[in-house]
């Protein structure tokens, strides 16, 4: 039974990732037109968390509805693309530079923030983003 559930979860995640990569006719959220999904994981309630390297946020996807779960939209650069940043704070006040992958970890989720060279932790009970490991400095020592 557990194997069947894992297979169904994987299949649903794959279908969701493919559907997000294709342009949508009707934009229900910014994710439908500006998303660059790179990581995905399922949540206990059946929704999904998707990391978005373009918008610099983590989305929560439930059915055809998507809302920002972690991170904040930042100002655009010269070409209008979000810049991102680094800030450990509440979910709706935190900044990511390049959220790459997401995975369940302890009582929350680990998110690799590739451009900041850190792994961030989103705790379920605290609704907070905090750095779990790494340093913002580039190099092989972190």
Predicted regions: what they are:
Residues 56-60, 117-121:
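A short loop-to-beta-strand structural motif that recurs across blades of beta-propeller domains
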Residues 27-39, 65-98, 127-142:
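Gly/Pro-rich loop segments of beta-rich domains
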Residues 1-11:
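Bacterial N-terminal signal peptides that target proteins for export
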Residues 42-45, 104-107:
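Residue-level detector of Asp-centered blade-edge/turn motifs that repeat once per structural unit
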Residues 17-25:
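C-terminal segment of classical bacterial N-terminal signal peptides
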Residues 50-54, 111-115:
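Conserved beta-strand positions in repeat-built beta-propeller and related beta-rich domains
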Residues 114-117, 134-135:
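Surface loops at the rim/top face of extracytoplasmic beta-rich domains
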């Amino acid at each position: 039974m557990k194997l069947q559930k894992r297979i169904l979860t994987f299949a649903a995640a794959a279908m969701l990732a493919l559907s997000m990569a294709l342009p949508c006719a009707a934009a229900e959220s910014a994710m439908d037109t500006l998303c660059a999904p790179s990581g995905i994981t399922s949540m206990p309630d059946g929704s999904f968390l998707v990391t978005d390297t373009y918008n610099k946020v983590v989305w929560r996807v439930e059915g055809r509805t998507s809302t920002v779960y972690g991170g904040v939209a930042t100002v655009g650069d010269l070409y209008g693309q979000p810049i991102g940043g680094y800030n450990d704070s509440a979910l709706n006040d935190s900044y990511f530079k390049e959220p790459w992958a997401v995975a369940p970890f302890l009582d929350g989720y680990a998110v690799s923030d590739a451009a900041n060279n850190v792994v961030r932790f989103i705790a379920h009970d605290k609704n907070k983003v905090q750095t779990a490991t790494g340093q913002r400095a580039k190099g092989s020592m972190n």
